[in-house]
Amino acid sequence: MATSNNPRKFSEKIALHNQKQAEETAAFEEVMKDLSLTRAARLQLQKSQYLQLGPSRGQYYGGSLPNVNQIGSGTMDLPFQTPFQSSGLDTSRTTRHHGLVDRVYRERGRLGSPHRRPLSVDKHGRQADSCPYGTMYLSPPADTSWRRTNSDSALHQSTMTPTQPESFSSGSQDVHQKRVLLLTVPGMEETTSEADKNLSKQAWDTKKTGSRPKSCEVPGINIFPSADQENTTALIPATHNTGGSLPDLTNIHFPSPLPTPLDPEEPTFPALSSSSSTGNLAANLTHLGIGGAGQGMSTPGSSPQHRPAGVSPLSLSTEARRQQASPTLSPLSPITQAVAMDALSLEQQLPYAFFTQAGSQQPPPQPQPPPPPPPASQQPPPPPPPQAPVRLPPGGPLLPSASLTRGPQPPPLAVTVPSSLPQSPPENPGQPSMGIDIASAPALQQYRTSAGSPANQSPTSPVSNQGFSPGSSPQHTSTLGSVFGDAYYEQQMAARQANALSHQLEQFNMMENAISSSSLYSPGSTLNYSQAAMMGLTGSHGSLPDSQQLGYASHSGIPNIILTVTGESPPSLSKELTSSLAGVGDVSFDSDSQFPLDELKIDPLTLDGLHMLNDPDMVLADPATEDTFRMDRL
């Protein structure tokens, strides 16, 4: 009996010991949980304070340090909420688990065999048997996973959403995350973020801290809240919207690859489009399509289109721009832009700009059929071209197509210079002059001679330089004059030869665009187009404003140069080109002294070349076509 009883006694003692240990462990865990909760609450409060202070302060100062002034006011409520909410959840869990543990051990003391008790204690010692994980892991893991979920910058922005107070449930946060992503992606981010911040701020004022994941509370992220958000985002939500594990650049005012505004209507984008066109294809397309095309198009239909584009620009800045421009471009624009999109990848939007420009410039005769639909919306711009109308006659359709391509800007194509002025004016007062200025002195002079539009001459150059990158506009001006002149062309040729392959590809894309849009180009315009294609097709940079300049912009073998200058000089260049081509006649390239083919090494267009330009179905893969558009032939 003694021996038989001893094991039971030992087992009972062991069970009691284990139970005591479990209880002690549970109590210890509870204490630790409370401590961790308080710490977490403190951290959250601190982080929230940092976020609140950081956003509010960062908005003005952009510093990551908390704003001591706001610590007292905004964060007083949060500490209580966070501890209570999180502690309430965790406490209930811990008490539940502890009760389970106690019950389990008691039951086991009664029922379980000596072996099971220690095993149960060892395995589940910190939890009820039903709980697969230790109690210490139950509530914290959920919290950690939840925090992890929110660690995403997207989730951080999700905290911005008013629903975030429910962030304790990971599912709700996921939903919020998605919402936040949708909100952040659109080009309207700033406005939506502002409104969302205001709304979510209200919701978050009390619940931010509790609901916001700790990861979202990282104070360092608060550096990025935009200054304008400070008032609204003094609360954490703004910081969440702006910051997360990754900073939300949308709130920052320094441009992201795709400009945050994505709104072509913003005056800054014209400058961005011209200056940054060289840098970013997508950004250029966004800036150009949104900034440049948007500029031209914003007036007629681009602003509506812009918003859609603004939303899509992130993924399809070029596409969005295409869509924006396409309404104006109509058939031509979609084709040219669609092809241009590919070309853009090759030539940084060069093809696109070219097609837009070429399409707008060259389409006149060909585009006449396509332009009619777009012209309806864009033909008003053609009137501004009256200055260049003489040039425009061939460009008359051109104006429609240009207007189609550009909306307001297409007129510059048709008008070349004058249109660009009207284009810019819809966009920005400065831009019209910008567009004119692109041609600047040389281009303007040429344009004056060819188009004889005085308005384009002086006003454009100063403003256009300002509107678009001033440096580039001078370049474009020189490009216009020089492109027609031998020296600049030679420079471009050097760059072109260096980029011959890429340019050839660009040319192909551009030619495809030109071919697809060749119908847009009239035979004369085709000549212009071929000239532009031969000269600037490759060089046509992805600047919609430059589209008109296409010939010249493409003239510059260097799309980047043109891109920088594109915003400003291309209008003048395109104006000059169009005006010269239109005014001198589509075939003027061959005979026009302004465009000495010999100096430019541009062979006169042959019937085949014209046919290729005019044939929308023409396949550029044809070696003859390739030959026609070879860089060396430029």
Swiss-Prot record:
Comp. bias regions, Pro residues: 362-397
PANTHER family attached to this UniProt entry: CREB-REGULATED TRANSCRIPTION COACTIVATOR (PTHR13589), CREB-REGULATED TRANSCRIPTION COACTIVATOR 1 (PTHR13589:SF14)
Pfam families given in the database record: TORC_C, TORC_M, TORC_N
Processing and modification events after translation: Phosphorylation/dephosphorylation states of Ser-151 are required for regulating transduction of CREB activity. TORCs are inactive when phosphorylated, and active when dephosphorylated at this site. This primary site of phosphorylation is mediated by SIKs (SIK1 and SIK2), is regulated by cAMP and calcium levels and is dependent on the phosphorylation of SIKs by LKB1.
Species per Swiss-Prot/TrEMBL record: Homo sapiens (Human)
Record site feature (Breakpoint for translocation to form the MECT1-MAML2 and MAML2-MECT1 fusion proteins), residues: 42-43
Protein name listed in UniProt: CREB-regulated transcription coactivator 1
Function field: Transcriptional coactivator for CREB1 which activates transcription through both consensus and variant cAMP response element (CRE) sites. Acts as a coactivator, in the SIK/TORC signaling pathway, being active when dephosphorylated and acts independently of CREB1 'Ser-133' phosphorylation. Enhances the interaction of CREB1 with TAF4. Regulates the expression of specific CREB-activated genes such as the steroidogenic gene, StAR. Potent coactivator of PGC1alpha and inducer of mitochondrial biogenesis in muscle cells.
Cellular localization per UniProt: Cytoplasm; Nucleus
The family this protein is said to belong to: Belongs to the TORC family.
